[in-house]
Structure formats: structure tokens, C-alpha cells
């Protein structure tokens, strides 16, 4: 948002990202022109010219790297199963048994699914 009012920018960024994230057709965010000294609308940037962070960047971090980022530690059942919920996206699962560790990446798509990790 191209305004010198940084609090308004932060509020707008929060509301806009939440609206986008809530829509089923949105699969990601791309931020163009994040640095004030190279932005076509300098007041809209997330970093000032001296690279200090503006409040709208903190909002972005709080949502994208905080509230919307799934982090989970757990212990599987006796059958070796662990049921979890997560946001759509790419994950890395790491499991250890008897001193051996296995990692695997997978994508969690809408509708969920089952991921099987074979342990030695």
C-alpha cells in the first residue's frame, strides 16, 4: 500500500494476506519491490532504504512464517501411525527408531492424504 502511514500499511497487509489466504484458488504469495530504494512506489516497500524493517514486513513474517507455518513434534502410536493436521504445502518428515533416522519430503494437498515413511 503506497502510503507513508506505516500503521495503515501493516493493517492493510494483514487484512489483504488473510483475504488471499482464505481463498481456495490462492497457492502462494509473491512480494514484488520489497526495498524502498528500488521500489516503483517507495512508500509501499517492506524495507526502508537503510534496510530496517517496516511494520508491514513484521505482519508478513507473523503470518507466513508464524501462524501459517506448521511445526509438529510427535510420537507415533504402537502401530507406527501419527495423525496430524497441517496447512497445504511442502513438508519434511523425519522419524527415528532404534537409533536410525529417515527423512522424506512430501506435499500436503487440499483434501489431505496419507504419507508412508518406511523405517529400517
Feature locations, PLM:
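Aromatic-rich peripheral "rim/lid" segments of glycoside hydrolase catalytic domains that contact
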Residues: 1-120
Amino acid at each position: 500500500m503506497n502510503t507513508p502511514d506505516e500503521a495503515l500499511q501493516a493493517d492493510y497487509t494483514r487484512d489483504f494476506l488473510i483475504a488471499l489466504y482464505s481463498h481456495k484458488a490462492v497457492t502462494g504469495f509473491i512480494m514484488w519491490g520489497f526495498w524502498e530504494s528500488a521500489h516503483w512506489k517507495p512508500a509501499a516497500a517492506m524495507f526502508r532504504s537503510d534496510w530496517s524493517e517496516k511494520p508491514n514486513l513484521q505482519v508478513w513474517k507473523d503470518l507466513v512464517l508464524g501462524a501459517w507455518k506448521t511445526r509438529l513434534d510427535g510420537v507415533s502410536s504402537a502401530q507406527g501411525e501419527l495423525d496430524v493436521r497441517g496447512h497445504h504445502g511442502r513438508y519434511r518428515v523425519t522419524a527415528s527408531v532404534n537409533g536410525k533416522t529417515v527423512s522424506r519430503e512430501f506435499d500436503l494437498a487440499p483434501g489431505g492424504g496419507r504419507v508412508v515413511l518406511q523405517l529400517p
